[in-house]
Amino acid sequence: MKLKELERPAVQAWSPASQYPLYLATGTSAQQLDSSFSTNGTLEIFEVDFRDPSLDLKHRGVLSALSRFHKLVWGSFGSGLLESSGVIVGGGDNGMLILYNVTHILSSGKEPVIAQKQKHTGAVRALDLNPFQGNLLASGASDSEIFIWDLNNLNVPMTLGSKSQQPPEDIKALSWNRQAQHILSSAHPSGKAVVWDLRKNEPIIKVSDHSNRMHCSGLAWHPDIATQLVLCSEDDRLPVIQLWDLRFASSPLKVLESHSRGILSVSWSQADAELLLTSAKDSQILCRNLGSSEVVYKLPTQSSWCFDVQWCPRDPSVFSAASFNGWISLYSVMGRSWEVQHMRQADKISSSFSKGQPLPPLQVPEQVAQAPLIPPLKKPPKWIRRPTGVSFAFGGKLVTFGLPSTPAHLVPQPCPRLVFISQVTTESEFLMRSAELQEALGSGNLLNYCQNKSQQALLQSEKMLWQFLKVTLEQDSRMKFLKLLGYSKDELQKKVATWLKSDVGLGESPQPKGNDLNSDRQQAFCSQASKHTTKEASASSAFFDELVPQNMTPWEIPITKDIDGLLSQALLLGELGPAVELCLKEERFADAIILAQAGGTDLLKQTQERYLAKKKTKISSLLACVVQKNWKDVVCTCSLKNWREALALLLTYSGTEKFPELCDMLGTRMEQEGSRALTSEARLCYVCSGSVERLVECWAKCHQALSPMALQDLMEKVMVLNRSLEQLRGPHGVSPGPATTYRVTQYANLLAAQGSLATAMSFLPRDCAQPPVQQLRDRLFHAQGSAVLGQQSPPFPFPRIVVGATLHSKETSSYRLGSQPSHQVPTPSPRPRVFTPQSSPAMPLAPSHPSPYQGPRTQNISDYRAPGPQAIQPLPLSPGVRPASSQPQLLGGQRVQVPNPVGFPGTWPLPGSPLPMACPGIMRPGSTSLPETPRLFPLLPLRPLGPGRMVSHTPAPPASFPVPYLPGDPGAPCSSVLPTTGILTPHPGPQDSWKEAPAPRGNLQRNKLPETFMPPAPITAPVMSLTPELQGILPSQPPVSSVSHAPPGVPGELSLQLQHLPPEKMERKELPPEHQSLKSSFEALLQRCSLSATDLKTKRKLEEAAQRLEYLYEKLCEGTLSPHVVAGLHEVARCVDAGSFEQGLAVHAQVAGCSSFSEVSSFMPILKAVLIIAHKLLV
C-alpha cells in the first residue's frame, strides 16, 4: 500500500542502510518533461518519516544541476566520518558524470559538487557502486563503454575491454556481484549479459538468449549465490524474466512470465533472496518468490508505467517506484487499507476550503465497491523471522533460543544458535503442601496430618471435615462420628440420671434379643422346679401353702358382657388376635403389646404398626423407624434440618452392608434439595460412607473456579480417605471413578507443570486402566529420563496397529466327495469386522490337534457365551458339511483362549490362523453355501442331519467362502474359511449320537433324527426364508444370499429347507439385576435428551438410539458380552450419572478399540452418538 508520494518527474536513489534518518534523493529525469517544459536539472533530498501520517515527504535539501539525470546512486563513501552522509553520483547526457557531497547539500554550506567528469561519449545510463569497496564506481554509456572509477582519484578511470572486442551498443545496466567483489556484469539491449573479471580485465562469460528476441532492460545478481543472476526483457513480444546460473549457462534455470508487456525495471531484495520486484508496461508491480515462481505481491499502478523500482536498503518492507506520469511513490509490501489514503486526501481538501470550521458531511452517491485492502506478501519475508523465541515444554520446562547480535559494520558470519532449557516454578506454596502430603502418605503419620489440618482450618465446615477424616483412620469410628455430631452416651447417661434421680445403665442394646422373653420364662420355670426337686416332699398342706400364699387375695376372671368379659373369653379360648383387636379399639395399647408378644412375631409386628399409625406424637416417627428398622424412610423423608440426627441414626442402627448406600442417599438429597451450606455439609456423609467419587463430585459443585490451591485441598482429602479405605479393604479394593480420575489427572498434570514429575507419577492410581491416566503415566515415566533407570516401564497406552500386514490370503481346499475335486473361491477384500462366536458346550467343533495351516496367534478372541438350556434348537446340517470352528472347545463349555493376530482390534486374522465360524447353510446339488448371518449363530447351535458320518483324512489347505455381512450392513459379503483339520466325506452307516467329549482327530458323531421327521423337497426358495416363529425371534435379520460352490456328487435329496425345520420359540430373558442400573442410566439419559432436544433430526436420532440399545439389553440378557465390555459399559453409565460426558466418551473409545467389532457394532456407535448429543445439549 502507498505510504508516501512525491510529484517529481525524476530519477531516484535511496540513502545507504547505515544512514539515519532515511532519505530519498531525486534528480530531474532526462527522459521526461514537466508541464513547464523546463530543461533545467535539479537534485533534491527528502526525508522519509513514516511516523508522519501524511503522504508528503519532508524537503531537506536542493541543488541546481548542470544537466538532467539518467541514473542516480547513493553510496556510503566517506560516511565513516562523523560529518559525512555519503556521496551521490549522477549520470547525465553527453557523458556527464557528477559527484555530490550529501552533507553539504543538507547543510547548504560549502560547495556540494565533489567532481564533474565527462569521459563517456554518450548518455550515462548505468551506474553502480561496489558493495565491498565503496570507492569503486562502475559507469556505462553508449558504444559499450564501461569505466571503473576510484573515488579517491577520479583522474584516470579503468576501462574494461576494448571497443574492438565489443560491438558498439548501449549499456542498459551494470551490477556488482554481491559475493565476489571483483565480478561485474553488464546488460545490453541485444539480449546478452557480459560478466567481467576485474582482475583479468576481460569478460569471462557471456549469457544470451537463443531466441534473439530478448531486449535486456535490467539485471541483478543473487544476494546469496554468487553464480546466479536475472535478466529482464522490455520487449512486449517476450516479457519474461530469466534466471541464469553461470555454471550451467547453456539455458536459463527458470523463465518467469507473469507480466503481459515488456519489463522496465528489476530489483532484488537484499533482505530476502527469494523476493524479486519488477515493474512493466502493463502498469503492474509484481513481487515474485523465486523459490516457487509464485507472484506473492501484486500492485496495480493505475495505468502508469513505472520505469524504476528499488527496495529500500534500511526498511526491507518498503520500495519506491518512479513512473512516467511524474510521480514517485513509496509502497509497503506488508499491505494496508485504501480507506486510509482516501481519508487523508479528503482531509487535505477539506482543510484547504474550510474557514476554521469543519465542512458539512457530503452525501456521495454509491459507487462501485473497490477492494478495500491490498493483501500483504503471501509468504512471510525473511526479515520478519523472529530473532528469538520461547516455548513451554512438558514438565514446566521453558525452551528459549536466540541469535547473537552482530554490529552493523561487520558482515554477519554463520554462528551456532544457542538453545536454553530452564525450569519454571510458579506455585511454590502448592509444591510445599504437595510435598507435605506425600511425606505424610509415605510415613503413614496421617493422624497428626489430619489434626494439623483441622487446627489450621479457618472455616468450621472444613474443620469438621478434617475431624471426620481423622476418625476414618481410627478404631471404633462410629461412636466417634456420633460424638462429633454432638451425641455421646456418657453425656446422655448423666442427663437421664439427673432426670430420673437415679443411675441408668445405657450400655445395653436398645432392643431385646429375639429369645430374651422365652429364655427368661424358662429360667423362671427351672428355678421354681429346682426348689422342689432338691428337697424332700413336704406335707400336702405345706405344699399348697407355698403355692398360694396365705395373705394373697383370690382374683376373679370377669365373665361380664362388657369389654373385659369379651377379653376374658378370647383369652380363655386362646384367640389372642381378637383380644389384641379389642385392646387396640379401647386404646389399651400396653395390654395389646403384651398380648401380641405372647401371640408371636407376626402379631407383635402388626400390633406395633397399628399402634404407631394410631398414636401420633413428636417422637412417634422416630419410634417407628427404630422399631421397624426402616432407615431408608429416615433418609428420604426426614427434614434436612435434622440431617445430623438422621446421620446419627444410621451410625447407631444401620448394618455394615447398607450403611454406605444410606449415607450416600442422605448426602445426595442434601446436595439436590438443600442450600449451598448443606451441599458442603453433604461431604461428611460421603466421608462416613467412604465414597471418594461422591466426595469429588460434591467438591466440584462447590468449587466452580479451579485453582491450584483448591485442587490441593481436594487431593489432600481424597488421599486421606483413600488411605483409610485401603486399611479396611486392602490396597486392591479401591478403584477410582471417572470424576476422581479426572481430578487426580488434573492434579498430576499441575504437579508436572511445576517440574515435580516423580511426585506427579506417585499420585496416579496404580491399577487404573483409563486412557488419560495411562497416557499421563507413560509420559511422566519417559520425561524423567535417567531418574527411572531400572524401573519397569508402564504399558504402552495406545493401541498398536500393524501397518501393511496381509490380512487375508487366497487358498484352496479339497473336498473329497466322490471324485474329490478341488475348488478355489476368490476372496473379497477384507473388512475390519470379525465374528468369533463360541460353539455350544455339548458340541465340540474343533479337534484337539491344530491344523498345519494355522499360523501364529497373538491376541485373544472375543468371548461369546454358549446358549443356555432355553436356547432354540440348532439348525440341521447337511451330511458331509462340517462347520468351521474358531477355537477348541472343552467339555462342559470351558473355553480355550486362542489369541487373535497382532493388529488393530477387530480386524481379520492373518493367513493360516483360524477364522471366525459361520453358521452353516444348506447344501444342495452343485452348491456349497454358508448363508447364515453371524448374529444368528450364538442362538442356533449346529446339529447335523441325514445318514452317514464325517470322517477326517489328511488335512488340506482351506478354501474361502463368502459369508454375509452383519445385520444392517449393506454391501457385498465377506469371506470365511472352511475347516482345515480334515476332508469331509459322506459315509453310509449306522447313525451315531453326538458325544459331549471331543472326538479324536476331528471325527464328529451325530444324533439320530426324530423318527417322525421327514426330509423336505429340494430347496426352491431362498435359503434364509425363515419361518414366522424364527422371524419373530430375530426380526432384524435381513435376507442373505451367497455365491456357492460345491464339488459334484452331493445327493440332492439330502438338501433341506430351513422353513421346514421344527420351530421352537424362545422367550426373552429378563435383564439380570446387576445390569438394571445400566439400563436405567441410559434410558434416563435418552429421556433427558428428548426433553431438551428441539430439532427434528436430533429427536429422530434419539428414537433410533432407543431401538438400537435394545440389542445391548438383549446381549446382556444372553450373557454374550465379554467381561471387559460389560465393565466398560458400567463405567460409561457412571460417567453419565455424574454428567461427565467427555470422560464417558473416552471410556467408550477405549472399550470400542479393545473389543471385537461384531460384538459391539450393534450398540456402541449409537451410544457414542447419544453421548455426543448429551454433551451438546448440556443435559
UniProtKB/Swiss-Prot annotation:
InterPro entries: SEC31-like (IPR040251), WD40/YVTN_repeat-like_dom_sf (IPR015943), WD40_repeat_CS (IPR019775), WD40_repeat_dom_sf (IPR036322), WD40_rpt (IPR001680). WD repeats lie at residues 17-56, 67-110, 119-159, 166-206, 209-254, 258-298, 301-341, 391-422. The lineage of its organism: Eukaryota, Metazoa, Chordata, Craniata, Vertebrata. It comes from Homo sapiens (Human). It holds the Pfam family WD40. Residues 812-856 are annotated as: Disordered. SUPFAM superfamilies: WD40 repeat-like. Ubiquitously expressed at low levels with specific expression in thymus and testis. Expressed in testis by Sertoli cells, Leydig cells and spermatogonia and in cerebellum more prominently by Purkinje and granular cells (at protein level). This is Protein transport protein Sec31B.
